[in-house]
UniProtKB/Swiss-Prot annotation:
Residue ranges of domain CARD in the record: 56-148
Annotated CDD domains: CASc (cd00032)
Name of this chain's protein: Caspase-5
Effect of residue 315 to A: Abolishes protease activity
Pfam families hit by this protein: CARD (PF00619), Peptidase_C14 (PF00656)
Tissue expression remark: Expressed in barely detectable amounts in most tissues except brain, highest levels being found in lung, liver and skeletal muscle.
EC number(s) stated in the UniProt entry for this protein: 3.4.22.58
Alphabetized UniProt keyword annotations: Apoptosis, Hydrolase, Protease, Thiol protease, Zymogen
Function: Thiol protease that acts as a mediator of programmed cell death. Initiates pyroptosis, a programmed lytic cell death pathway through cleavage of Gasdermin-D (GSDMD): cleavage releases the N-terminal gasdermin moiety (Gasdermin-D, N-terminal) that binds to membranes and forms pores, triggering pyroptosis. Also mediates cleavage and maturation of IL18. Cleavage of GSDMD and IL18 is not strictly dependent on the consensus cleavage site but depends on an exosite interface on CASP4.
Organism: Homo sapiens
């Protein structure tokens, strides 16, 4: 009797865990995962597939769900254990220390309950969970991610912690209408988008960048939601940062990608990003010029004609970038003129050495950038918010301008994000969800 109740309890756990997944048709993901990993034989797989000879559709669906749940229970230790660990390891689920200990020590059946409880508490985690399942197999194109719950208005007008997706119809309309004006987007099943995050938080001679881990988590989740596989590195010297950038530029996945993001967060000076060994008497700096050289068309042909977006969160000097003025008409603008020249050039084939770049820096030259110890950098926080709200309908330059506009009125701590070395020749839409 006790044994039967134990089985019922386990069954209940798995049913609760996969209720939403079964209703959404994501059982196809599990079937495909089993086929790839040869978890069960063809006979076992067939028990998950409805019998097409059955006459009653409702009976067929009920039988299918019962068989699926039963099979999932049978395969739990082989498949789901790996899924749970993957989610915890990649910070899809944010568990408190006591929850983590309980999670790793408990049985597979109870891990399902912990997972469900965590998802219920956090709507974003629920969406990330679904997106992670889909990202684990990018070739499943018949299943629409549950992230597309944004068809209606959000829970509140000010809700900004959810990535809004671009409806498929709008994506197709914009691609058709502005075909020659936008960067082409590769099909989801054919592309491998990569993004790199380098964040230095601990230094040998400089203060620690407290709160920077919020920036890492936020940017990583944003980029993953936009379809990028994220490589993240922490606490590197300038030489190590350069080595990581060169290795990243050489990745073969860029050939099948349509764009890339580089996110660099550290202390900084006007000319570049500080490495962990930096001090005034002995600088340890990765120059911005070096970054552009590594990814230009001479050294990184795999990203030729593809947007290369560089996000920089770092001080660029020690000034505060603010001043007090009276309300008065603006001063006369300085007018510069340049005499025309007769230019001639002969070449069989020519390409620009530096093209399709755009850098977005957290402050203007010579000025500081601000970071909140409890929330992360002000610039990165606002950047993530604007991407979440506007990447569904705006191209990259429009999103960057919206970030700048949010800093238009100086607050207690003033800074003005700056777009630099922009050589994009088309509009770059991210079309999240497509």
């Amino acid at each position: 009797m006790a044994e039967d109740s134990g089985k019922k309890k386990r069954r209940k756990n798995f049913e609760a865990m996969f209720k939403g997944i079964l209703q959404s048709g994501l059982d196809n993901f599990v079937i495909n995962h089993m086929l790839k990993n040869n978890v069960a034989g063809q006979t076992s797989i067939q028990t998950l597939v409805p019998n097409t000879d059955q006459k009653s559709t409702s009976v067929k669906k009920d039988n299918h769900k019962k068989k699926t749940v039963k099979m999932l229970e049978y395969l739990g230790k082989d498949v789901l254990h790996g899924v749970f660990n993957y989610l915890a390891k990649h910070d899809v689920l944010t568990l408190k220390e006591e929850e983590k200990k309980k999670y790793y020590d408990t049985k597979i059946e109870d891990k399902a309950l912990i997972l469900v409880d965590s998802l219920r508490k956090n709507r974003v985690a629920h969406q990330m969970f679904t997106q992670t399942l889909l990202n684990m197999d990018q070739k499943i194109t018949s299943v629409k991610p549950l992230l597309q719950i944004e068809a209606g208005p959000p829970e509140s007008a000010e809700s900004t912690n959810i990535l809004k997706l671009c409806p498929r119809e709008e994506f197709l309309r914009l691609c058709k209408k502005n075909h020659d004006e936008i960067y082409p987007i590769k099909k989801r099943e054919d592309r491998r988008r990569l993004a790199l995050i380098i964040c230095n938080t601990k230094f040998d001679h400089l203060p620690a960048r407290n709160g920077a881990h919020y920036d890492i988590v936020g940017m990583k989740r944003l980029l993953q939601g936009l379809g990028y596989t994220v490589v993240d590195e922490k606490n590197l010297t300038a030489r190590d940062m350069e080595s990581v950038l060169r290795a990243f530029a050489a990745r073969p996945e860029h050939k099948s990608s349509d764009s890339t993001f580089l996110v660099l967060m550290s202390h900084g000076i006007l000319e570049g990003i500080c490495g962990t060994a930096h001090k005034k008497k002995k600088p340890d700096v990765l120059l911005y010029d070096t970054i552009f050289q590594i990814f230009n068309n001479r050294n990184c042909l795999s990203l030729k004609d593809k947007p290369k977006v560089i996000i920089v969160q770092a001080c660029r000097g020690e000034k505060h970038g603010e001043l007090w003025v009276r309300d008065s008409p603006a001063s006369l603008a300085l007018i510069s003129s340049q005499s025309s020249e007769n230019l001639e050039a002969d070449s069989v084939c020519k390409i620009h050495e530096e093209k399709d770049f755009i850098a977005f820096c957290s402050s203007t030259p010579h000025n500081v950038s601000w970071r909140d110890r409890t929330r992360g950098s002000i610039f990165i926080t606002e950047l993530i918010t604007c991407f979440q709200k506007y990447s569904c309908c705006c191209h990259l330059m429009e999103i960057f301008r919206k970030v700048q506009k949010s800093f238009e009125v100086p607050q207690a701590k003033a800074q003005m994000p700056t777009i630099e070395r922009a050589t994009l020749t088309r509009d770059f839409y991210l079309f999240p969800g497509n």
